[in-house]
Swiss-Prot record:
Domain (OBG-type G) ranges: 160-328
EC number: 3.6.5.-
Molecular function terms from GO: GTP binding; GTPase activity; magnesium ion binding
Cofactor: Mg(2+)
CC annotations in GO: organellar chromatophore; plastid
Homology family: Belongs to the TRAFAC class OBG-HflX-like GTPase superfamily. OBG GTPase family.
Binding site for GTP: 166-173, 191-195, 213-216, 280-283, 309-311
Protein name per UniProt: Putative GTPase Obg
Family matches, as Pfam families: GTP1_OBG, MMR_HSR1
List of residues binding Mg(2+): 173, 193
UniProt organism field: Paulinella chromatophora
Sequence ranges assigned to domain Obg in this UniProt record: 1-159
Stored Gene3D superfamilies: GTP1/OBG domain, P-loop containing nucleotide triphosphate hydrolases
Keyword Acetylation listed: no
Length: 329
């Protein structure tokens, strides 16, 4: 499935139905009074979070949405039928913003959560409303009002509690595959991960936590370089970041600084998020090199440095333990 996490759409609530002019027509009542009914209200536009959806792909093919118009009024003071509401399903984690101003209108994070986004127009009044002592045969009625219309920006931010970050080829996809049952694409070239990978990892109490592996960050990612910037929004909701560093890289400290700098440049509090720094692929290092590199990274990051090998199960389990401790579980 193609992963689409942004969409621009236009929504139109329904127009209210018109009121009508009508008079009572009954036998032996030659001068029946006004009986024109009111128009029905236009349908509203409502967003609803759906846990079965994972992407905004549907909005690539349909971008304009209309709720149903209200029906015109009827004789005998009968009101027109209101237009049906239009319910638009979106994935959990979708933010809805006004396209022009960027103002956040709603954040749909829970299954079945709804957001009323555009109200239908009021129905017009029938001539029955305009009967008075001075006007016993009113011909006046009003038209239904137009419904609200909004240009909208939809943004999907994945609901993951732990984000795995690092430069391209740091081993993030391998790690999330070992931590969970996720099966990400893995190969020895940059940007193997072209979309965020999600994996559910089970805690000791049996509950699961969602991990997200986003495409690798490079220098300038916060300004649009590479692939990372488009997906940094997906770790905005995380409680913890796992920063993975490839021990076979030429300059580990430089790699650490690059990613830390991009978190600062991106903003949204990512640089202040609790994190664990992990040195991966340690099977390639001697004991002395491992100690040296760990010390250097600790001095720059101020964090405890964990060392793991994806080939050694015990190191993966140790990392899980550290993550649970950080999350308070």
């Amino acid at each position: 499935m193609q992963f689409i996490d942004q969409a621009r759409i236009m929504v139109y609530a329904g127009r209210g139905g018109d009121g009508i002019v009508a008079f009572r027509r009954e036998k032996y009542v030659p001068a029946g009074g006004p009986s024109g009914g009111d128009g029905g209200r236009g349908g509203n536009v409502i967003f609803e979070a759906d846990s079965n959806l994972q992407t905004l792909l549907d909005f690539k093919y349909k971008r304009i949405f209309y709720a149903e118009d209200g029906n015109r009024g009827g004789p005998n003071r009968c009101s027109g039928v209101s237009g049906s509401n239009l319910v638009i399903k979106v994935p959990c984690g979708t933010e809805v913003r006004h396209l022009g101003s960027g103002i956040l209108l709603g954040d749909l994070t829970e299954p079945s959560q709804q957001l009323m986004i555009a109200f239908g127009g009021r129905g017009g009044l029938g001539n029955a409303h305009y009967l008075s002592n001075r006007n016993r045969v009113p011909e006046k009625f009003t038209l239904g009002r137009e419904g609200e219309e909004w240009p909208l920006q939809l943004e999907l931010k994945l609901l993951a509690e732990v984000g795995i970050i690092g430069l391209p080829n740091a081993g993030k996809s391998t790690l999330i595959g070992n931590l969970s049952a996720a099966k990400p694409k893995i190969a020895d070239y940059p940007f193997t991960t072209l979309i965020p990978n999600l994996g559910a990892v089970y805690r000791p109490n049996g509950d699961s936590i969602i991990f997200a592996d986003i495409p690798g960050l490079i220098l300038g990612a916060a300004n649009g370089a590479g692939l990372g910037y488009d997906f940094l929004r997906h770790i905005e909701r995380t409680r913890l970041l796992v920063h993975l560093i490839d021990s076979s890289a030429k300059d580990l400290v430089h790699d650490l600084i690059v990613v830390e700098g991009e978190l600062i440049a991106y903003g949204h509090g990512l640089a202040d998020r609790p994190r664990i720094v992990v040195l991966s692929k340690i099977e390639l290092l001697s004991g002395e090199e491992l100690h040296q590199f760990s010390q250097a990274l600790r001095m720059v990051s101020g964090c405890k440095i964990l060392v793991i090998s994806s080939a050694i199960l015990s190191s993966i389990e140790f990392l899980k333990t550290q993550i649970w401790q950080q999350l308070g579980t």
